[in-house]
């Protein structure tokens, strides 16, 4: 929505799925199907602002059925940081836990409470035992979010790294769609 506003793409509209789907990627496809069925009658072109998001290719199968495109990549982290940069990050430390601006802001609700760590602290060691580093991929320069991300890393017992990515390849992908 921010990129649409910044670029004056007034002919584009956005619909959002519930953010809690980050914790249950197996439910994303069903939610997309419902939204696509409703949108087909209203819009001549539809573009999905998701990467694969942990669905194991199921989003792609659904989108083939509806003849709809999506953002390239396996994760939003990949299109925010850029494909090559994301590959380098993973090569440097495969045990990286990524946060975006949205996930920093929603961490307590989506992760801490959503994964029940607040009531079962023993889950922290189970969920995060293979992670070594928290990488915050910032879309906007925001010192408060950087501080919050650093505090989250400390809370999780992880090293902290900040990388300003802006909107990365997301802007290019949307631009290509918006100008077609």
Feature locations, PLM:
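Gly/Ser/Thr-rich loops at beta-strand to alpha-helix junctions
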Residues: 1, 21-22, 49-59, 77-79, ...
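N-terminal basic/disordered segments at the start of proteins
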Residues: 1-8
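Structural alpha-beta junctions
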Residues: 8-12, 41-42, 65-71, 151-164
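A short beta-strand-loop structural module common to alpha/beta enzyme folds
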Residues: 10-29, 162-166
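Short, well-structured alpha-helical segments in soluble
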Residues: 31-42
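Long, charge-dense
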Residues: 58-110
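A conserved mid-domain beta-alpha-beta active-site/ligand-binding segment of alpha/beta enzyme cores
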Residues: 90-145, 150
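C-terminal, charge/polar-rich interaction regions
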Residues: 138-180
């Amino acid at each position: 929505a921010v990129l649409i506003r910044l670029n004056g793409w007034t002919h584009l509209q956005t619909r959002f799925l519930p953010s809690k789907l980050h914790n249950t990627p197996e439910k994303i496809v069903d939610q997309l199907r419902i939204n696509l069925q409703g949108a087909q009658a209203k819009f001549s072109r539809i573009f999905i602002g998701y990467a694969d998001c942990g669905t194991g290719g199921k989003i792609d199968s659904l989108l083939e059925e509806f003849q709809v495109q999506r953002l390239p990549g396996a994760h939003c982290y990949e299109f925010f940081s850029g494909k090559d940069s994301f590959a380098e990050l993973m090569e440097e430390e495969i045990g990286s836990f990524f946060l975006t601006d949205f996930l920093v802001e929603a961490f307590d609700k989506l992760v801490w409470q959503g994964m029940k760590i607040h009531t079962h602290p023993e889950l922290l060691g189970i969920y995060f035992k293979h992670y070594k580093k928290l990488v915050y991929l910032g879309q906007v320069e925001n010192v408060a979010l950087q501080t919050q991300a650093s505090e989250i890393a400390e809370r999780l017992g992880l090293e902290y790294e900040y990388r300003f990515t802006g909107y990365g390849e997301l802007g290019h992908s949307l631009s290509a769609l918006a100008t077609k």
